[in-house]
């Protein structure tokens, strides 16, 4: 079966809580549409290079609060899995570097949920570090499980097997009073889905700073992207990502 790379880009204005997540929003200082289009082009090229499908979802389906919840459809709609046995989700502020290897060939397991290493979870030891990860819905879970399963949800690979294991918990998303990232981690913990830990270079935040190693996928995550926007654009252009 084929592999697929999926992005979502739907105007938040079409939802009941458009300000729920303002990390990628048009303003007089930031062309979010242009930024997201550049991300999509990078993954379309990446998918074509390795003969995978690329799908950009631009119409709402779940229609719950904000477009960030739309990715739960990957668990809920059986039609995805009639054609694919693996789907990689990527945020619309993630960019595939031209020389990035084929992630599906790098991590071949079809029985696990594949997420990137994330030190904020795996290496949290100080009280202030633990407070950042062990709250909300996750406060109901054991800290060791939160540290083990925790990940940054801007990049992940969902296999059909993992989808089937996690689905009963993802189905509860409207009943869970927390953000989508916590719901994903909670579903991992509750389902005890087997994990594959992928290299952080497939979800790397500060690639545009000098001295940082070459990454495979650059994630311009968080509000700091607006502070460093010029530097980010320079970095992308040097990589040939227009």
Task: Cite the ranges covered by each PLM segment.
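Conserved donor-nucleotide/metal-binding helix-loop-beta segment in metal-dependent transferases, i.e.
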Residues: 95-141
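Catalytic core and acceptor-binding pocket of nucleotide-sugar-dependent glycosyltransferases
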Residues: 146-241
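Charged, glycine/proline-rich intrinsically disordered loops and linkers
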Residues: 15-32, 123-143
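A conserved donor-nucleotide-binding helix/loop in the catalytic core
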Residues: 35, 62-90, 97-106, 113-116, ...
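Catalytic phosphate/metal-binding cores of nucleic-acid and nucleotide-processing enzymes, i.e., regions
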Residues: 57-58, 93, 143
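Non-transmembrane alpha-helical segments in soluble domains
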Residues: 44, 104, 185-189
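N-terminal anchoring/stem segment of glycosyltransferases
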Residues: 1-73, 77-84, 221-225, 234, ...
């Amino acid at each position: 079966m084929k592999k697929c790379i999926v992005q979502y880009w739907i105007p938040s204005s079409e939802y009941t809580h458009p300000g729920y997540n303002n990390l990628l929003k048009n303003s007089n200082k930031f062309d979010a549409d242009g930024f997201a289009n550049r991300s999509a082009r990078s993954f379309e090229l990446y998918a074509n290079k390795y003969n995978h499908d690329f799908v950009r979802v631009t119409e709402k389906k779940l229609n719950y609060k904000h477009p960030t919840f739309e990715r739960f459809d990957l668990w809920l709609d059986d039609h995805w899995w009639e054609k694919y046995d693996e789907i990689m989700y990527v945020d619309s502020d993630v960019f595939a570097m031209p020389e990035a290897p084929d992630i599906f060939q790098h991590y071949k397991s079809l029985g696990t949920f594949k997420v990137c290493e994330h030190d904020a979870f795996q290496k949290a030891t100080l009280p202030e570090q633990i407070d950042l990860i062990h709250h909300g819905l996750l406060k109901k879970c054991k800290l060791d499980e939160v540290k083990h399963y925790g990940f940054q949800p801007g990049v992940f690979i969902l296999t059909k097997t993992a989808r089937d294991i996690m689905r009963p918990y993802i189905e509860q998303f409207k009943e869970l009073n927390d953000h989508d990232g916590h719901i994903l981690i909670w579903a991992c913990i509750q389902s005890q889905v087997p994990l594959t830990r992928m290299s952080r270079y497939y979800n790397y935040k500060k690639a545009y700073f000098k001295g940082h190693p070459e990454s495979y996928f650059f994630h311009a995550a968080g509000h700091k992207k607006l502070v460093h926007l010029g530097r980010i654009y320079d970095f992308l252009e040097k990589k040939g990502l227009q």
